[in-house]
Swiss-Prot record:
Subunit structure: F-type ATPases have 2 components, F(1) - the catalytic core - and F(0) - the membrane proton channel. F(1) has five subunits: alpha(3), beta(3), gamma(1), delta(1), epsilon(1). F(0) has three main subunits: a(1), b(2) and c(10-14). The alpha and beta chains form an alternating ring which encloses part of the gamma chain. F(1) is attached to F(0) by a central stalk formed by the gamma and epsilon chains, while a peripheral stalk is formed by the delta and b chains.
Localization per Swiss-Prot or TrEMBL: Cell membrane
GO cellular component terms, A-Z: plasma membrane; proton-transporting ATP synthase complex
Sequence similarity: Belongs to the ATPase B chain family.
Gene name for this UniProt entry: atpF
Protein name: ATP synthase subunit b
A molecular function GO annotation: proton-transporting ATPase activity, rotational mechanism
Length: 175
């Protein structure tokens, strides 16, 4: 059995040694096959793999750029939101200040009107008081003249009457 195995291993029955022709043909065939594989299979396969690698790298770069853009947009949105909130706060503060000013103006105008009404009322009261005093003075003078004329039993002149009235008014005012 070992002889049969040796025969198959060595290549053919009855030959001895290495068959260089077969080895060279096999080697040349193998090299041709490698060259054909490189040209028709390995080259296009490598091109496809290189293109795929390029596409993947491009997609990764695009994704990173999109991420950066998204971060920038998020920062811009945060900044815009902050500016908007600041502006709203400023408007609210201005509104409060304006409301306080209007409140103070309304109170001031109301005080001015009230003071004007009080002054008008006081002026009217003083006018009425002066009229009442003048009426009382006229009545007193008429009564004084009447009493004096009855006491003296004579009529006095208008000039004398005025002098007497002024004298009595002065005396009444001093008391």
């Amino acid at each position: 059995m070992t002889a049969t195995t040796n025969m198959f291993v060595l290549g053919a029955a009855g030959t001895s040694g290495v068959q260089w022709g077969t080895i060279i043909v096999t080697l040349v065939t193998f090299l041709i096959l490698l060259a054909l594989l490189k040209k028709f299979a390995w080259g296009p396969l490598k091109d496809v793999m290189d293109k795929r690698e390029h596409d993947i790298n491009k997609d990764i770069d695009d994704a990173e750029q999109a991420k950066l853009n998204a971060q920038k947009l998020e920062e811009q949105n945060k900044q815009t939101l902050k500016e908007t909130q600041d502006e709203v706060q400023k408007i609210l503060e201005e509104s409060k200040v304006q409301a306080r000013k209007q409140h103070e103006e309304i109170i001031h105008e109301a005080n001015i009107r009230a003071n004007g009404m009080i002054e008008t009322a006081q002026n009217e009261i003083n006018s009425e008081k002066e009229r009442a005093i003048a009426d009382i003075n006229n009545q007193v003078s008429e009564l004084s003249v009447l009493i004096a004329s009855k006491v003296l039993q004579k009529e006095i002149s208008d000039k004398d009457q005025k002098a007497l009235v002024e004298k009595y008014i002065k005396e009444a005012g001093d008391k």
